[in-house]
Amino acid sequence: MDQPAQTPEKPTARVEFETMLLGRYTITARYRRDGTRLDRSAYVLLSRLSAEGPMSIGQLTEAFGLDASTLNRQTAALLRTGLVDRIPDPVGGIARKFRITEAGEQAMKDEHLANTEGLDRVMVNWSADDVAAFANYLERFNTDIERLDGRPWPRP
């Protein structure tokens, strides 16, 4: 039986495949000091609140492009675990806002440290220049996604 002719793969097809694989890996055990897991959505939400300060459900909906019911569930879980609290709008608006707590900041720092240590283990044989180049490409990739999506992410 004849085999179909091989055509060179588009580079973006490789990117798609590799990002699909990346999404399935967990670099660290992702457990906080108290032994509970900080899931990805909690980490991302805490990161945004830490970077921008208190935000309402409406602001979070706009920032994440998610519906309010999803964010209500996520923020309710963070409230129950004491990682965020609800406060009146500091500038006098009607909507109450979510603010990261000290426990939330610590959980986020612990997660960041665990993730960084995991990446250090993965990239142990990479040169510092390769790690820096990879970080630059990831930032460029993410900022281009944000540009197309219209939702830039605050960076340090």
Task: Give the role of each language-model region.
Residues 16-19, 42, 46, 101, ...:
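Generic structural concept
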